[in-house]
Structures are given as structure tokens and as C-alpha cells.
Amino acid sequence: MSYQFIEVSSKEQLDKVFAFRYEIVCEKLGVNELDYCESGRETDEYDAYSVHFAAFDEAGEVAACTRLIHHSPIGYPTTNNMEYDTVTWNFDQDSLGEFSRIFVSPKLRSIEKLKPLFNSLKTIGNAKMVDLNISYTLGSLEKPFFRLLRILGFPYQRIGDLQSYVGLRYPCIMYTDELHSANPEMFKDTSVT
């Protein structure tokens, strides 16, 4: 079965996403310092400013998820929790977003399964970034995941040193136009305004 990301469009789907996040974050990763793991759901203050995406299996269960935080009046996980040179990396808040809570079921963690899954995320994520006028997208990425995303055609750049934030992570940025350049076969007719 080939999995495809879709935009979460119902409370039932969103509840399944929060339960999947709980399973991955709170149970499998053993991250107990998060304040928002309760009642079998993992949520946080950024969810209110997010568009959620998920891939569902044939039984309707979540196999992968992420969110695109946008136009957040409370900032972003990367801006609020990581250090980077804010003079060099000064972003227009009206054009800024952040992909976070990118989780994939262990059954999909082979490169053969990840490629089509993340190609679908590029397609739907790009459409939403263009629709929301997002020119750049932050991410707090672990070193192996940073490398994997670049292999999969997500041209994130490190904007700071490796630092402790729910494990060791780099603050990163991805420009929407560079996502298009890195994937010309997918975005040949796309332009960012």
C-alpha cells in the first residue's frame, strides 16, 4: 500500500493524530518532560495555529503525521526554544511557518516507503505554504532526520549549532522557492509570490 499525506479535515481525524503523537512521543520516545501528554493525546499551544497533515492506513489509523504552524502570535518552537543568529536569520513573521511533529510509524521507515510518502507531503505542504504566503519554514531537526529530509528533497539549511531541545537538534530553515528548485519535476509550474 502506498501512503499519502492529506490535510486533516475533521475532529475525528485530528483526535487520531493527537493519539498517534502521544504513542510516538510519550510512549515510544519516553519523552516525559512534555507538558501536554495526558489522556492518551499529545497536544501543545502551537496546535491552535497549525494546519495538520496525516497519512492513514487502510483501517483508518494514522501512519504518519506533521503540522505546519503558521501566523503564530506566540512564536514557533524553533524561535522560542533554540538559539541562532537572529540578525543574520531575521524572518518576516507574515511569511514564516514551521513544520513540526513529523512522525512516521515504524512500519514505514524504509527509504522505499518514505519517498512516496514524503513526495505527497511536498505536494500538499507546498500547496498550503503557497496558499498561506509562507516563504520560509523553520524546523528543529535531529542530525539523522536533517540528512534524511535533504535526501528526500527537503532543502533545509542549518541556521545554528546542534543544541539540546527534546534531544539534540539543529535549528533549520527551508525556503519555499528552494523546495521548488530541489524538486523541479514536481513544481515546474509553481512560483512563490
Where are these regions (language model features)?
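Short, His- and charge-rich active-site/binding loops that engage polyanionic ligands
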Residues: 59-89
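Short amphipathic alpha-helix that is part of the acyltransferase structural core
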Residues: 1-42, 47, 52-62
